[in-house]
Regions:
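Generic structural signal for residues in well-ordered beta-strands
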Residues: 7, 42, 146, 194-195, ...
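Conserved AMP-binding/adenylate-forming
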Residues: 1-10, 14-111, 117-120, 133-134, ...
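AMP-binding/adenylate-forming catalytic core of the ANL superfamily
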Residues: 68, 73-74, 94-95, 100-190, ...
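Conserved nucleotide-binding/hydrolysis micro-motifs of P-loop NTPases
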Residues: 15, 202-203
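Short, well-ordered coil loops that connect the C-terminus of an alpha-helix to the N-terminus
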Residues: 4-5, 13, 142-143, 187, ...
Length: 280
């Protein structure tokens, strides 16, 4: 209670006229942003390999989409891009607005937010919510903080890995944490392949996890392992985000051998000052 007033959570986007859900008095639940407002629609969907949407069942995590007459007409495009015109390309599908948020709707109609769709780990077309991994690891007494991301993988596109801040000064035991995760996470595909110790989870200026830094680290690790396996252990790998994509720069090795070593990974590689190339 603040100044004798109750704070009730809601949820919405400007593109859907701001308010889509609201918590009614007496319906407060941890993590919930309430239920849908009159005239609005909200549901969770999963995205198939072909891009199609499938409605989630009650309590199943998916991407939240908003429907109804409050969904906006579209963005006015830049004249340099052929505008001015109103465009909803890639944002609204069949009247439903892609929020970019992950969440679920329970069997009572309450909506819960769990994360951002861009943080999904997609393993062989299977969507994995990193919160499932993070919550499982945070339940271990040796873990003070945790973050999960996808690591590039030749077979599945990416596989889950986790970064944890140890809770104490004792030795870090990855084997124990992997075994814990194997028991605590019911879905086999969501169990992390590796767990790395880290001094602190990188954060944004507003205190949210900054996962691009962890994605870069995971990519550097997998590229370094591949180069070492190809007898290129002296090669140096660094990572940087350029124009919205992650680019790895490899120095100290023959470009053709580097390309062969990382073949099959969805990585963008630059050998020294050369132009960045997507690995086959």
């Amino acid at each position: 209670m603040l100044f004798r007033s109750h704070l009730l959570e809601g949820y919405g986007l400007t593109e859907a006229t701001c308010a889509t859900t609201w918590t009614r008095p007496g319906e407060e639940r941890p993590g919930s942003v309430g239920r849908v407002l009159p005239g609005q629609q909200i549901k969770a969907v999963t995205t198939g390999a072909d891009g199609s949407w499938t409605d989630c069942g009650p309590g199943e995590t998916g991407m939240l989409v908003i429907g109804g007459p409050a969904v906006f007409a579209g963005y006015v495009t830049d004249p340099a891009l052929g505008g001015p015109r109103v465009s909803r390309d890639g944002i609204v599908r069949d009247g439903w607005l892609d929020t970019g948020d992950l969440g679920q709707v329970d069997d009572g109609g309450l909506v819960y937010l769990t994360g951002r769709a861009k943080d999904l780990i997609i393993r062989g077309g299977h969507n994995i919510d990193p919160r499932v991994i993070e919550d499982a690891l945070l339940a271990h007494p040796a873990v003070a903080a945790a973050a999960a991301v996808g690591r590039p993988d030749r077979h599945s596109g990416e596989v889950p890995v986790a970064y944890v801040v140890p809770a104490g000064p004792g030795p870090f035991d990855e084997t124990e944490l992997l075994a814990w995760a194997g028991t605590a996470i019911g879905e086999a595909a969501a169990r992390p392949q590796r767990i790395y110790p880290i001094d602190a989870i990188p954060l944004t200026s507003v205190g949210k996890q900054f996962k691009p830094a962890l994605l870069a680290d995971a990519a550097v690790r997998v590229a370094t392992d591949a180069l070492t396996a190809a007898a290129l252990a002296d090669a140096q790998v660094t990572a940087a985000h350029e124009d919205g994509r992650l680019v790895l720069t490899v120095t100290g090795a023959d470009p053709d051998r580097v390309r062969d070593a990382v073949a099959g990974f969805a990585l963008t590689i630059r050998c020294g000052p050369a132009t960045a190339l997507r690995s086959p």
